[in-house]
Amino acid sequence: MYLFFITSELKKWLRDPLLSFMLAYPIVFALLGRYGVPWLAKVSGINMALFADLVLVVLTLMTPHIFGALIGFSILEDRDDHVLTSIQVTPLSVAGYLSFRFVLVTVLACVSTWFILWFSQMGGLTLSQMGAVALLSSFAAPLTGLIINATASNKIEGFVAMKGIIGILIIFPIISLFFMDAKEFIFAIAPGFWPAKVISSIVRGEGVLLLSQGQYYW
């Protein structure tokens, strides 16, 4: 049954031009990290090693939100087609149906994020560190999907909501990287704050990531 759901979901994504295009984003991000950033550094003469954590944060945080948008649009389509209403008369509950789909995108986001970190070869992260960062950041995928469905009633509204949601959820962690005092915790409300802090701590060689304001500054 679960294999059928996975196949059905992937077919739905591939049928839609927008969703199928979004599926290619992780590959694009991986190629940008591996070849685009070094090329830009060579052309501009900028030492990108100084900004490795910033680049990795952008690539890492974007991926789960893309998968969250995928499942968000897919559920919006189901709502338009009254699929969720039809499921209520089947042995499968709506909660079980949605839970499975959110687990699916979380796993895909985790694997894709790990692949981007591994393929880009930036920051000197170990495989276990890549796995930890990928797992931590992947939980943003279902959150994005839920927020899109809470703020939009159709795919057009969903597209507008997606741009605003992803922009806000990504810009806060990025801004936090420019603060070296307790002010950075202002941006801790964003889900991507801690994945960004983990990446920054590893890339900058700060060692153990402290988890409270007191440990950091007192």
Q: Where are the regions that the model predicts?
A:
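N-terminal Sec/SRP start-transfer signal
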Residues: 1-19
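Hydrophobic alpha-helical transmembrane segments of multi-pass membrane transport proteins
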Residues: 51-89, 94-116
